[in-house]
């Protein structure tokens, strides 16, 4: 429980700081920023298992099942961040959608490796320039989809009750 709260607080704080920089004030959007920060950090952890192992760092077990589990968790955080992106100021919204898609695509590329041997032999996994262009174009559809998406209660509200005890969403930075 402590590790979970610590991880979510640290990873979520990165998203929260970005939200404050972008002048996001909606509580739902701040929660989405926390979720997006967590999703991106989980993706980094899954991507860097081999590199971290060489440096005697271990955030998850170094087997493909743990990587899959981590990426599925990341995916749930990417999903929960989407609807509240609608409340982010328009001038920042598209960039956030692109970053969300590009990072999520890193996870998809990892999953496409299918097993640990392929993962180990692939080197650093990243999204190519063409892939980034593709994800940018797909983000246009996300932007349009947001116009027709109704704002609803945040998907991970129960988990945020733990985070809310640690982070004051009304605090000024």
Language model features with spans:
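Catalytic cores of Mg2+-dependent Asp-rich isoprenoid enzymes
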Residues: 3-40, 46, 50-173
């Amino acid at each position: 429980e402590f590790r979970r709260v610590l991880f979510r607080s640290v990873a979520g704080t990165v998203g929260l700081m970005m939200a404050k920089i972008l002048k996001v004030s909606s509580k739902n959007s701040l929660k989405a920023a926390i979720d997006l920060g967590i999703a991106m950090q989980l993706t980094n952890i899954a991507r860097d298992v081999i590199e971290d192992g060489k440096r005697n760092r271990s955030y998850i077990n170094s087997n493909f099942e743990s990587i899959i589990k981590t990426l599925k968790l990341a995916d749930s955080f990417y999903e929960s961040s989407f609807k509240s992106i609608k409340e982010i100021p328009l001038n920042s919204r598209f960039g956030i959608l692109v970053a969300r898609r590009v990072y999520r695509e890193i996870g998809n590329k990892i999953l496409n490796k299918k097993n640990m041997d392929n993962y180990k032999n692939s080197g650093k996994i990243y999204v190519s320039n063409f892939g980034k262009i593709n994800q940018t174009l797909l983000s246009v559809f996300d932007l349009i989809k947001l116009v027709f998406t109704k704002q609803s209660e945040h998907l991970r509200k129960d988990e945020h009750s733990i985070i809310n005890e640690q982070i004051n969403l009304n605090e000024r930075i």
